[in-house]
Amino acid sequence: MLREFVTTTCAGNDYSTWSRPNRRLLGQEIYLPSGISEKVEDLVVAVDTSYSVGNRELNVAKTEIKSICDTVEPDMVRLLYWGSRVVGDETYTVDTMNSFVTSTRPKCGGGTEVECVTDYMQEKAIKPQAAIVITDGYVSGWSKWDCPVLWVIIDNKGAKPNVGKYVHVRSEDMR
């Protein structure tokens, strides 16, 4: 589900444009549109590190995030660790993504107020193409998002965000 969300929400778009004809054929006086490819620029992954999310879930999340990044190759991934406030902010680029799984250091953050993530993003002018929020869903509210958001809710079938898409995951199914 994570990979599908990222690839459909922010995967690069390929399209053709007549504003720049294909130069390879101009010498033969053949005018065809040139192909333009847009790629994924920025992706935010916000990880709930309140005390109800354990190491097993964090390790599986790290591996899945790395796999997604290998698939869509974003220019930058902004990893935010949060509880009642954002307690960790790590940035990974195409060049540093290979070290992501071993170099990231989750920081614990107490309560679970997801609004701290959107406030932080606004304060730091972080404007991703999409956000993925990994949480147990025991939050005080779902906040308002300025980008598409996917909620990965662990062990809480009752949590139903009123914004974005969501998927429920059982921690015992995470391997």
Identify the meaning behind each predicted range.
Residues 13, 28, 55, 89, ...:
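Intrinsically disordered, low-complexity regions
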